[in-house]
UniProtKB/Swiss-Prot annotation:
<dbReference type="InterPro" id="IPR022642">
    <property type="entry name" value="CheR_C"/>
</dbReference>
<dbReference type="Pfam" id="PF01739">
    <property type="entry name" value="CheR"/>
</dbReference>
<dbReference type="Pfam" id="PF03705">
    <property type="entry name" value="CheR_N"/>
</dbReference>
<feature type="binding site">
    <location>
        <begin position="200"/>
        <end position="201"/>
    </location>
    <ligand>
        <name>S-adenosyl-L-methionine</name>
    </ligand>
</feature>
<feature type="domain" description="CheR-type methyltransferase">
    <location>
        <begin position="1"/>
        <end position="274"/>
    </location>
</feature>
<feature type="binding site">
    <location>
        <position position="72"/>
    </location>
    <ligand>
        <name>S-adenosyl-L-methionine</name>
    </ligand>
</feature>
<comment type="function">
    <text>Methylation of the membrane-bound methyl-accepting chemotaxis proteins (MCP) to form gamma-glutamyl methyl ester residues in MCP.</text>
</comment>
<keyword id="KW-0808">Transferase</keyword>
<dbReference type="InterPro" id="IPR050903">
    <property type="entry name" value="Bact_Chemotaxis_MeTrfase"/>
</dbReference>
<dbReference type="GO" id="GO:0008983">
    <property type="term" value="F:protein-glutamate O-methyltransferase activity"/>
</dbReference>
<dbReference type="GO" id="GO:0032259">
    <property type="term" value="P:methylation"/>
</dbReference>
<dbReference type="InterPro" id="IPR000780">
    <property type="entry name" value="CheR_MeTrfase"/>
</dbReference>
<dbReference type="InterPro" id="IPR022641">
    <property type="entry name" value="CheR_N"/>
</dbReference>
<dbReference type="InterPro" id="IPR029063">
    <property type="entry name" value="SAM-dependent_MTases_sf"/>
</dbReference>
<protein>
    <recommendedName>
        <fullName>Chemotaxis protein methyltransferase 1</fullName>
        <ecNumber>2.1.1.80</ecNumber>
    </recommendedName>
</protein>
<feature type="binding site">
    <location>
        <position position="115"/>
    </location>
    <ligand>
        <name>S-adenosyl-L-methionine</name>
    </ligand>
</feature>
<dbReference type="InterPro" id="IPR026024">
    <property type="entry name" value="Chemotaxis_MeTrfase_CheR"/>
</dbReference>
Length: 274
């Protein structure tokens, strides 16, 4: 094995232990593209040196590396159907079952905030057409591993490029305030439903409490089968009986029939906690 390949193996082990992400052996180009600038700034010549520096030094290097490797582009109202299923099927059902209690939604691995803010907009749209049905309100808890992503998400400000990814002109006008050339901010009424917290999905979820819905979309694809199963079992522990799990369009929940019931929607699939 060449020195470069050995260094890459060291880094793969570090990343999986730190945040569960499994890198294929063909992902050296991805690691280079994400870390070259940081390594140059830090005067680090190889991935092996980077891992050694992380292990022997205190400071923010570990967080900067994890930030660089876990930051992903995201969309407003990604795949559309989960938000329609939420409004047309899940909210009416849970309101009926919950007897007027506040509903809680967890947006796991929320990145720069588009998913939780999309959820808050969908809640607002539901309220406008179902007056008085959500008297106790809805709390959205949004978590991410990346400190820089959480800072950006809390700020709730986006540029033209981000705004063009899945947001209709009507929603832009209704739910955002212009903040100068090419920048918009999520309106306070939409932001007020969302609470952002730092969380590594490998860590305990006990502090989060119980939820009526969990959105863990386009996240599990990065984990090994073993870690994925562990996360899904622990998510089940955060769901109230009859609560719903939303996964990504290309993700499936296999081999957990004692915990989740598949619910066919049109289109899409969601999962009800047993």
């Amino acid at each position: 094995m060449s020195a470069a390949n050995a260094d890459f193996e060291l880094f793969r082990v570090f990343l999986e232990k730190t945040c569960g992400i499994v890198l294929g052996s063909n992902k050296q180009y991805l690691v280079s593209s994400r870390l070259n600038k940081l390594m140059e700034q830090q005067g680090i010549k190889s991935l092996g040196e980077l891992v050694q520096r992380i292990q022997t030094q205190r400071g923010g290097l570990r967080e900067m590396v994890v930030d660089a490797m876990t930051t992903n582009e995201t969309l407003w109202f990604r795949d559309t159907y989960p938000f329609e299923v939420l409004k047309q099927r899940v909210l009416p059902e849970l309101i009926k079952a919950n007897g007027g209690q506040r509903l809680r939604i967890w947006s796991a691995a929320c990145s720069s905030g588009q998913e939780p803010y999309s959820l808050s907009m969908a809640i607002d749209e539901f309220e406008k057409t179902n007056l008085g049905q959500l008297k106790a309100g809805v709390q959205i808890v949004a978590t991410d591993l990346s400190g820089s992503m959480l800072t950006a998400a809390k700020a709730g400000e986006y540029d033209t490029l981000a705004m063009g990814r899945g947001l209709s002109p009507e929603r832009l006008q209704r739910y955002f305030d212009a903040k100068g050339p090419g920048r918009w901010a999520v309106k306070p009424a939409i932001r007020s439903r969302v609470e952002f917290r730092a969380l590594n999905l490998l860590d305990s979820y006990a502090s989060l409490g119980k939820f009526d819905m969990v959105f863990c979309r386009n996240v599990l694809i990065y984990f090994s089968a073993e870690v994925k199963r562990d996360i899904l079992l622990r998510i089940h522990g955060t769901l109230k009986p009859g609560g719903y799990l939303f996964l990504g369009a290309s993700e499936a929940l296999n081999n957990l029939p004692d915990h989740y019931q598949m619910v066919q929607c049109s289109p899409g699939i969601i999962y009800r906690a047993k």
